[in-house]
Amino acid sequence: MDAIKKKMQAMKLEKDNAVDRAETAEQQSRDAALRAEKAEEEVRSLQKKIQQIENELDQVQEQLSQANSKLEEKDKALQAAEAEVAAHNRRIQLLEEDLERSEERLKIATQKLEEASQAADESERMRKMLEHRSITDEERMDGLEGQLKEARTMAEDADRKYDEVARKLAMVEADLERAEERAETGETKIVELEEELRVVGNNLKSLEVSEEKALQKEETYEGQIRQMTSRLQEAEARAEFAERSVQKLQKEVDRLEDELVQEKEKYKAISDELDQTFSELTGY
């Protein structure tokens, strides 16, 4: 009977563990639902950003930066979705394994209960055999009567313990059924979340098509940027050449200005000499 009690305690502990796992599965399902909603919000955000890219294609540098950022976000979202799908598959596998172990333990408990019932039936059979046995010796009969009473007491105790074991087993079976129902509910939620993730995956594929078109446009603008860059380099080269030419011309202008100043000074000196000569001639 002690062995049965220990086994019943072990079954109760396993039942509690099954309930805990079911609650964990429910919490994980809720967490997965929140992640799916977040993924949908990210998809909507990506759609808005792609629209902004299409409306702001004239800003080539900003478009390239935003497109690269969106590609990185798309990769991260896709990796997160794949990781969530793998996690869901792993949780489903764990739940199935736990359910199989619970069913195996229930089967073992049922077999042991049948063995206990057979032992109780054997005790009852021995009690009946002792009741119908012919006893000739009074002292032996008294002793046998005492043994019979003790056997009856043990049989009654065995019956009570059997009834208690059966009642507890029924409670354990009911708890296991409820735990299995909760586990099935968790699996249903997981299936729903997988469907939501599939929809999110389709949305991501649509976004990838849109991004491929945007990338094609980006390549066209990148070609234009390269042409513009080449033209800019040529213009810069011409500007540098013109700047060097201007510097040379400026030096020539400075030289001519210096010569002009010198010629003015010479002219002034000659004028002064003529004035002086004229004054001298007039004085005479």
Swiss-Prot record:
Homodimer. Belongs to the tropomyosin family. InterPro entries: Tropomyosin. It comes from Haemaphysalis longicornis (Bush tick). The keyword Aminoacyl-tRNA synthetase does not apply. It holds the Pfam family Tropomyosin. Keywords: Coiled coil, Repeat. This is Tropomyosin. Tropomyosin, in association with the troponin complex, plays a central role in the calcium dependent regulation of muscle contraction. Residues 1-41 are annotated as: Disordered. The molecule is in a coiled coil structure that is formed by 2 polypeptide chains. The sequence exhibits a prominent seven-residues periodicity. Residues 12-41 have a biased composition (Basic and acidic residues). Residues 1-284 form a coiled coil. The lineage of its organism: Eukaryota, Metazoa, Ecdysozoa, Arthropoda, Chelicerata.
